[in-house]
């Protein structure tokens, strides 16, 4: 067995003292306290970051208020909030408040609250976007904005999507993992019949599902305004049809954690 000479041992001690002395000079601390600070800093940097909640954003159509629970977009967001007091951030927004929804997403993803998103915080994103009519167009447009920031989206859901001016609601951006489209073809106001992926290798289109209310009408809109009930009838029927929204809810819940084991990350209050 090779033993260190007295000279080698002395040299090692001098090097160790020099390192601690430099640390004390730089940080203004006693050597042992400085070493402890360095150890604590390393432990903090090695600690795993908190996981962000699953984010579910719905957009209402037309000029509907985000808190009008007679409309399924708002009602579904409220249901999810009630089922997931923690671990999920669910909110409905007017379709003209996309920037507010975008800001809410960035705020929820910023788990270390430093005002900017790291690569890890972006990669941790689990986002679901849905909407009806103009709201569906906004959902796709918001997904496209998130693509520019390298933020992935789990799922987009369009219900009788009506394209807004300067938007494209038929081509799903490549940052979206899955997308689905529900539409009806009748009336002067009706949705897109087909959506497609900008990059089929990255986005799976779950389907373009057609509903025909001329053959199978539903009477679910008694609480809606006269215009919706008598002029945009089919467009309104698909907005309140339980057969459609049960499928929408099932698609969303399939991406959420089990309610009995929701994570402890608490979403910030909805800002409207």
Ranges and model annotations:
Residues 65-73, 94, 98-101, 132-139, ...:
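Solvent-exposed, acidic/flexible segments
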Residues 48-125, 230:
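Active-site catalytic motif of lipid deacylating hydrolases and related acyltransferases
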Residues 2-16:
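Bacterial N-terminal signal peptides that target proteins for export
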Residues 76, 80, 87-88, 105-197:
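Serine-dependent carboxylesterase/thioesterase catalytic core
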Residues 25-41:
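Signal peptide processing junction and immediate N-terminal pro/mature segment
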Residues 37-51, 260-272:
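Long, low-complexity intrinsically disordered segments that are proline/alanine-rich
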Residues 174-272:
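C-terminal catalytic-base region of ester-bond hydrolases, centering on the histidine
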Residues 13-26:
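Bacterial N-terminal signal peptides
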């Amino acid at each position: 067995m090779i033993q260190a000479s007295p000279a080698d041992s002395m040299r090692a001690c001098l090097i160790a003292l020099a390192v601690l002395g430099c640390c004390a000079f730089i940080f203004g601390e006693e050597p042992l306290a400085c070493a402890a600070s360095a150890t604590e800093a390393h432990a903090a940097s090695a600690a795993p970051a908190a996981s962000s909640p699953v984010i579910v954003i719905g957009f209402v159509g037309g000029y509907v208020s985000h808190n009008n629970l007679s409309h399924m977009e708002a009602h579904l967001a409220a249901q999810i909030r009630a089922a997931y007091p923690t671990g999920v951030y669910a909110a409905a927004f007017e379709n003209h408040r996309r920037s507010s929804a975008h800001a809410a997403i960035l705020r929820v993803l910023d788990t270390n609250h430093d005002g900017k998103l790291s690569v890890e915080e972006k990669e941790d994103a689990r986002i679901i976007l849905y909407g009806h009519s103009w709201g569906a167009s906004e959902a796709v447009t918001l997904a496209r904005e998130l693509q520019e920031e390298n933020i992935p989206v789990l799922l987009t859901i369009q219900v009788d999507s009506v394209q807004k001016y300067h938007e494209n609601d038929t081509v799903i951006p490549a940052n979206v993992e899955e997308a689905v489209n529900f539409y009806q073809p009748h009336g002067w106001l009706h949705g897109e019949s087909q959506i497609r992926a900008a990059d089929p290798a990255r986005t799976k289109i779950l389907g373009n599902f057609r509903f025909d209310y001329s053959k199978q009408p539903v009477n679910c809109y008694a609480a809606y305004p006269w215009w919706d009930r008598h002029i945009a009838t089919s467009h309104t029927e698909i907005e309140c049809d339980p057969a459609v929204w049960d499928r929408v809810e099932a698609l969303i819940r399939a991406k959420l954690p089990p309610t009995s084991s929701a994570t402890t990350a608490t979403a910030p209050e909805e800002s409207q």
